[in-house]
A protein has these predicted regions:
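Mature N-terminal, pre-catalytic/accessory segment of carbohydrate-active enzymes
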Residues: 2-76
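Short, flexible loop/turn elements at secondary-structure junctions
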Residues: 58, 423-425, 438-442, 491, ...
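Carbohydrate-active enzyme catalytic cores, enriched for enzymes
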Residues: 216-219, 242, 280-463, 525-527, ...
Length: 692
């Protein structure tokens, strides 16, 4: 394949991914809270520079405070940790295209894609940080270095490999880097240099805006997650830098504000939940938070004026728990790791915005633990924590830390269909939690076919977990394992699961609307009683591949903060066998009617406690990732799951008792008695009654 054909092939793949999620505004399962937006401020914006973060009118005062106290706003850490490393680094040459022989398989070209955007992230960090340091320190040598980076980036071909249409992650970073250089160094460019950078910015800006307004029509297709992110990461900083210099800058800012005021967040409701899961909450929040900060600093507008922003820090607090790995849902580049440091910074940001002390606790927990954050690609390829500290301290103040409750609790995000049970939330070795998902967004975009799925963590280990690895969007592990119901803690009916296809799976006849039509709903919950409960209805989720299904609901009770009871009820118009799945990274010990997941420090006993146990035909331990190319998990641990087969029936009513215990020490003692629809459960001598 020639280089030009390879470039075109990647552009076609990129466009296919870009237009994923289709025009689905008629199917949006939530109503976005709308806010009026007043654009009159555009008529009075200052021409002074800088504008990005520190304002021209405030620059002298900021310099004086830093000179008097280098630790002011953690500026000294910003220099030491984020800027000095670029003092002797020469500006990078333009990246090369992916090797032609890789373009036919995502798992082959994804490493080159990732390395390219990581390099562009380094270029952005260098350009921005050296620009700030040079101006604040009044250091001509640093200013010269920052100029060199800015001018080098301006030579990158805007239609080449760092264009939005080839690698948008690289494109966003390149344009943002130049925007910082153009703004902070403006007075230090010659007229010719300034024009070169300005023209490069405008060319790239217009490409992105054409994509938003024409290719994906974002205002009518608000679910296009990369389109959304291009506003915060590229459009807003660039238009602030170009304001008064480019006649369309104001128009583009108005477009961005209309999107945020009227159409955002399409993935989250007023409850603060986020349908795409905590990793994509993380990336969206990171770029959005910075963009809103830059708008606050330059334009004086408060974009955090929706109920969603008041509550959304609760989502990672409860659904990406501090102490667990593999315990949440949707696409996750961090799968297999504890919640990352950027998540901590994002929740701290909302601590500043909303003065919520529990968020500071979460931040402090992650900050203390993640001492090697700089070694992980999803950090160094994306974030700069020294800059984050500087920005936060210039604009916000955080309250004093306060730990969340250690009592048994259930937090529900009913609009987006997420829930989380917790007990002893602040004690790592005692913490028990279950994260549950039944989302009306179905499997669209970065969501999966996993409505009514759960994970269970106890005593330091996620025993019932999500399995597999992250290799990038569209690789085998993504399209043949992670997106599908058979990789989740869920049932299959006649061997079939929920609709989890997308354009990358190459499923014949796929339409993106099928993904949302396969949504579920949290239909009932009780957060107040001693026994906490949540119920999800995932009937529609299975309908595409199991048209005979008439109803499928899963109900979970949390008893005394120690054990879980789960009921799966399904009715079908024809008899179908049912395969009840539970996945783990640990060892399974199977028996005729039960099984145990055995971790290093804890275990989970799973027993089927009603008459459904008589319908079990087999309990099997299975290893592997189905049809995933073994190349993608070479030298990585192969995970396991249990398949419990129930004989064919028109009705399935599976009642399961899940009891986590430590491997050593005192054990939770549980007994039960089932009479009709009443379950009497005795846990460590205390009796509780559940009406099924």
């Amino acid at each position: 394949m020639s280089n030009e054909k390879a470039l075109d092939a990647i552009r076609r793949i990129k466009l296919e991914n870009d237009t994923s999620a289709g025009n689905l505004v008629d199917l949006l399962p939530i109503e976005v809270q709308k806010r009026d937006f007043d654009l009159s401020f555009l008529d009075t914006l200052s021409e002074a520079r800088p504008r990005l973060l520190v304002q021209g009118a405030d620059l002298a005062d900021f310099k004086a405070k830093v000179k008097a106290d280098p630790s002011y706003c953690m500026y000294d850490d910003f220099i030491k940790n984020s800027t000095e490393k670029f003092y002797e680094t020469a500006p990078f040459e333009e990246p090369q295209a992916y090797p032609p022989e890789t373009v036919d398989k995502a798992s082959l070209w994804r490493p080159y894609w990732r390395q390219m955007y990581v390099d562009c992230q380094m270029a952005m960090n260098a350009t921005r940080n050296l620009s700030i340091a040079g101006i604040v320190n009044e250091d001509d040598a640093l200013i010269a270095k920052a100029k060199a980076w800015t001018l080098k980036l301006a030579t990158y071909d805007p239609e080449g490999v760092t264009s939005r249409g080839y690698n948008d992650e690289a494109a966003f970073r390149v344009i943002a880097a130049m925007a910082w250089g153009y703004d902070w160094l403006n007075a230090h460019f010659t007229d010719e240099e300034r024009e070169i950078v300005k023209n490069a910015l405008i060319t790239r800006l217009d490409e992105i805006m054409h994509h938003l307004k024409v290719t994906v029509d974002l205002l009518n297709n608000p679910l296009n997650s990369h389109g959304v992110r291009s506003i915060s990461s590229a459009i807003i900083p660039t238009c602030i830098a170009l304001y008064h210099d480019h006649p369309k800058a104001g128009e583009y800012i108005a477009y961005a504000l209309e999107y945020y005021a009227v159409h955002y967040p399409p993935w989250g409701g007023e409850d603060g939940g986020w349908a795409e899961g905590p990793d994509y909450w993380n990336t969206q929040t990171a770029f959005l938070g910075e963009a809103f900060d830059l708008l606050k600093a330059y334009c004086g507008v408060d974009m955090f004026n929706k109920t969603f922003y008041e509550n959304t820090g609760d989502f990672p607090l409860y659904c990406m728990p501090v102490h667990s790995k593999r315990a949440s849902f949707c696409d996750q580049s961090s799968i297999g790791d504890f919640p990352g440091l950027k998540l901590a910074y994002n929740i701290k940001h909302y601590a500043g915005v909303n003065q919520k002390p529990e968020y500071v606790w979460y931040y402090n927990q992650l900050k203390a633990r993640d001492t090697e954050a700089h070694t992980k690609f999803y950090n160094f390829g994306w974030w700069d924590f020294g800059y984050d500290d500087l920005r936060f301290n210039i604009l916000w103040d955080a309250p004093e830390e306060q730990a969340p409750s250690n009592d048994p609790l259930l937090k529900v995000f009913p609009i987006t269909g997420w829930a989380a049970f917790h007990n002893k939330m602040t004690e790592r070795e005692e913490h028990i939690h279950m994260v549950f998902k039944c989302s009306p967004f179905g499997s669209i975009s970065h969501s999966h076919g996993d409505q009514n799925a759960f994970t269970l963590h106890a005593f330091g280990e996620t025993l019932a977990s999500v399995t597999g690895y992250y290799g990038g969007f569209g690789v085998d592990m993504h399209t043949k394992w992670r997106r599908h119901t058979f990789s989740k803690n869920l049932p299959l009916f006649g061997g079939k699961g929920q609709y989890g296809e997308n354009k990358n799976t190459k499923f014949e006849g796929h339409q993106d609307r099928f993904c949302i039509e396969a949504g579920g709903n949290i239909t009932d919950y009780d957060t107040e009683s001693d026994i906490k409960m949540v119920e999800g209805d995932a009937t529609a989720s299975y309908k595409f591949f199991v048209p005979e299904i008439e109803s499928y609901k899963r109900k979970v009770w949390f008893v005394q903060g120690k054990v879980f009871v789960m009921q799966d009820k399904a009715t079908l118009s024809e008899e179908k066998d049912m395969t009840w799945l539970m996945h783990t990274t640990f060892t399974n010990e199977v028996a005729d009617k039960s099984f145990t997941i055995r971790g290093e420090n804890a275990h989970l006993d799973v027993n089927f406690i009603n008459e459904s146990a008589d319908n079990i035909t087999s309990v099997k331990n299975v290893e592997g990732f189905g049809e995933v190319d073994p190349y993608e998990f070479k030298d990585l641990e192969v995970h396991r799951h249990v398949e419990v087969e129930f004989k064919a029936s028109k009705e399935h009513n599976i009642l399961t008792l899940l009891v986590p215990n430590k491997n050593k020490g005192e054990q939770i003692e549980v007994s039960h008695k089932l009479v009709g629809n009443t379950l009497e459960l005795t846990v460590d001598g205390e009796t509780a009654t559940i009406e099924l």
